[in-house]
A protein has these predicted regions:
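Solvent-exposed beta-strand motifs enriched in subsets of small alpha/beta binding domains
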Residues: 32, 81-82
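An amphipathic, aromatic/His-enriched active-site/gating alpha helix that lines ligand/cofactor pockets
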Residues: 22, 46-65, 74, 83-120, ...
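Intrinsic-disorder/low-complexity, polar/charged segments enriched in Ser/Thr/Lys/Arg/Asp/Glu/Gln
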Residues: 25-29, 75-79
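Hydrophobic h-region of N-terminal signal peptides that target proteins for export
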Residues: 9-18
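Beta-strand-rich interaction surfaces with strong enrichment in secreted/lumenal proteins
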Residues: 67-69
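Cleaved targeting-peptide boundary
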Residues: 18-25
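N-terminal targeting signals for Sec/Tat export/insertion, comprising classic cleavable signal peptides
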Residues: 26-57
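Positively charged n-region of N-terminal signal peptides that target proteins for export
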Residues: 1-4
């Protein structure tokens, strides 16, 4: 059942990333778990800061980040689906993570959660 749920999520989430531009998108998926004692709201707040920085550096409001949280099951595990309009925007986001602001945001993510898996997908609406 767990594998089926993960498969369904990985099939559906890239479509969510296309909701804004209705064509193609680059979607980066992260599989994460909260560290002990950390509340999801802290991750959400840090992710909002990451998204604002990323949109500014990518020069696009078409960058989006989705947090997929558990409805039934282990509430400490979740997924990020970060959608970019193209590889150029994704590369700009990665470069921004090396800035002082980006390093601080990444350090906060490291304090809040552990991410065990990461994939980059190219998606196209059919």
């Amino acid at each position: 059942m767990k594998k089926l749920l993960i498969a369904v999520v990985f099939l559906i989430v890239p479509v969510l990333g296309l909701a804004d531009n209705h064509d193609t998108a680059v979607v980066e998926m992260w599989k994460c778990e909260l560290k002990e004692g950390v509340e999801m709201e802290k991750v959400e707040a840090n992710n909002k800061a990451w998204l604002a920085m990323t949109r500014k550096n990518a020069g696009s409001e078409d960058v989006n980040s989705y947090m997929l949280t558990t409805v039934v099951g282990d509430q400490t595990r979740f997924l990020f689906a970060d959608a970019f309009p193209d590889m150029k925007a994704w590369a700009a986001a990665k470069s921004a993570e090396d800035s002082e602001e980006g390093a601080a945001i990444e350090a906060m993510f490291d304090e809040l959660m552990e991410c065990s898996d990461n994939r980059l997908y190219n998606s196209k609406m059919q």
